[in-house]
């Protein structure tokens, strides 16, 4: 099978590869939803086995943090195929290709998610399941959007913690989902050809005053909380700051985006949508025989 990845590179991939290495959680997520267990995966934070993958990553060879995978450990896993996040691996393309056929996806925007899932499902020999997963998500997104209150549009922000928080434009996968539910993203849309995120100072945040803030949890270090402006934000005062799991960071996979949809709905409209049990939702999508 010959495919074109998000680098625009044409890759000859083996038929029904059995030994999948995942750089980022995207391919791990897709593989699990297809009933396949990868042989190697990166992590977001060492020792943090994400609930949206049912903690199953601890049974898989860990090959380092997603931004700096260890190529020696990757090679030891003897993969048939490597599925990677483009921006973290494009500089190592040559070394990766020596280990196994290397496929790179952007994994950044909701508009790319269906295509990435369907192509990877095809590569992994389960194209019908990929089509089903995409159709189910589109249906769920429409149902949740229809059920969301129409008279409120909570201002929201999705950010990586830091002294100057990095915030995500509306096309980014999680922000797209929150916006589809009626949220109003203070970071606004992407500029044509620009990046999918932007640095917003706490001063700017105070001016735009988000009512709900989703923070990608990079661990116990939360420098933004030490800034006196932080305490003045509406979201902080009303207790609507949510430190979210790794599925929000890696939301393009079928399991992650379904759970983000449910959590976002609950966090925006707690009266309308129930609290989410992440593991229970994940278990609906991960076949019993690989758990």
Q: What is each of the regions a protein language model found here?
A:
Residues 19, 25-73, 77:
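A short, structured surface patch at a secondary-structure boundary
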Residues 6-8, 16, 25-26, 36, ...:
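Solvent-exposed coil/turn segments that connect beta secondary-structure elements
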Residues 215-291:
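Structured C-terminal subdomain patch of bacterial secreted/periplasmic proteins
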Residues 1-26, 128-159, 267-291:
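Bacterial Sec-exported substrate-binding components of ABC uptake systems
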Residues 11-13, 28-33, 47-51, 164-169, ...:
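Short, solvent-exposed loop/turn elements at domain surfaces
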Residues 52-110, 145-155, 161-162, 166-249:
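Binding-cleft/active-site segments that stabilize strongly anionic ligands or cofactors
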Residues 2-3, 9, 19-21, 39, ...:
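Mobile, glycine- and charge-enriched loop segments
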Residues 14-17, 24, 28, 32, ...:
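Extracytoplasmic/secreted envelope proteins and their assembly/folding machinery
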């Amino acid at each position: 099978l010959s495919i074109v990845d998000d680098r625009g590179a044409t890759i000859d991939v083996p038929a029904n590869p059995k030994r999948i290495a995942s750089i980022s959680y995207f391919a791990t997520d897709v593989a699990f939803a297809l009933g396949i267990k990868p042989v190697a995966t990166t992590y977001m934070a060492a020792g943090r086995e994400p609930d949206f993958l049912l903690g199953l990553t601890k049974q898989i060879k860990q090959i380092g943090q997603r931004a700096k995978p260890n190529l020696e450990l990757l090679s030891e896993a003897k993969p048939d195929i490597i599925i990677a996040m483009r921006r973290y691996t494009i500089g190592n393309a040559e070394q990766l290709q020596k280990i196994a056929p290397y496929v790179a996806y952007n994994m950044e925007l909701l508009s790319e998610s269906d295509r990435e899932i369907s192509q990877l499902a095809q590569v992994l020999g389960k194209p019908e399941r990929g089509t089903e997963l995409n159709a189910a998500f589109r249906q769920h997104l429409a149902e949740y959007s229809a059920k969301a209150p129409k008279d409120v549009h909570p201002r929201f922000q999705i950010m990586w913690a830091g002294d100057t928080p990095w915030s995500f434009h509306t096309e980014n996968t999680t922000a797209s989902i929150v916006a589809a539910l009626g949220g109003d993203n203070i970071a606004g849309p992407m500029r044509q050809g620009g990046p999918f995120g932007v640095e917003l100072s706490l001063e700017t945040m105070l001016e735009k005053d988000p009512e709900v803030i989703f923070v990608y949890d990079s661990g116990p270090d939360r420098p933004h909380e030490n800034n006196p402006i932080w305490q003045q934000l509406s979201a902080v005062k009303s207790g609507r700051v949510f430190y979210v799991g790794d599925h929000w960071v890696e939301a393009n996979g079928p399991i992650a985006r379904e759970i983000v949809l449910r959590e976002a709905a609950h966090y925006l409209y707690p009266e309308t949508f129930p609290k989410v049990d992440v593991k229970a939702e994940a278990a609906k999508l991960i076949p019993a025989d690989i758990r």
